[in-house]
């Protein structure tokens, strides 16, 4: 009798794919069109088979351009097929917001990627982009200031901002509940430091941390990388390898992943020479602008911020006014605000 030859068990072929979803801004008026870009890639050198990219769109939106994808309910699917090793791709699709029943509505869209191969390192197989829809027809809640000036009516927009100052701004702007003193101490911040409660709250909330030597360095100017990391942690963005690196000077930087996530979220941009300058210090004018973007606030028009060292021609005037004044406002079509008289 012939000897039966066992059928060999197929060895699963791994696939390591990534997807990156973004848009050109974070606030859109009701009944307007939103364009999303989906970037995807194959990180391995071998092909991935039966690759599918999907995008989930928010409720109260309709698909305007599915980019040759298949629409089913609130999901668009693209059958990519075989994706060669190290290959990349981009899909641009468009949706339209419906009429809103509130002045501001938080929304999000999600992109995912899958394959018939055995997926590995799946943290970057989905990407979420958060944005705000707004209506000019409905009054929004008044905005509360989150940053103060100095004596003699100065704002000092070109001064570098310290880690302690940013801790206070974030705790104030994000309305973080004051944390109990858990006993975690920094050897350079005692309970008599003016920002002690803010630092403790920011650290306990997980958005700030100290250094390996047990210091916090409250008076050190914060860097672009440090602020990017703090914002990413607040937004609970993933510390994952990006599908695409957009800046020439961050490839080996410790904060590369968070920098790319914050860039994807349209909170901090790079420079015209293709750099991000991760270790550059941040000015007060830059910081207030970034926090306003995080909150989808401003810039504020028709407002006098009252600072003698901030001319109305200053590039950040509207954001400085937004962050330093308690005010009621009407929203404009471009997302900016006009202060009510």
Name the predicted role of every residue range.
Residues 130-197, 204-225, 232-257, 269-281, ...:
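Feature responds to low-complexity, polar/acidic, surface-exposed segments characteristic
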Residues 1-131:
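Exported/extracytosolic protein signature
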Residues 39, 94, 112, 171-172, ...:
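Short, surface-exposed secondary-structure boundary micro-motifs
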Residues 261, 288-297:
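Short glycine/proline-rich, acidic loop/turn segments that cap or connect secondary-structure elements
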Residues 55, 168, 229, 289:
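DNA-binding alpha-helical recognition surfaces that contact promoter or target DNA
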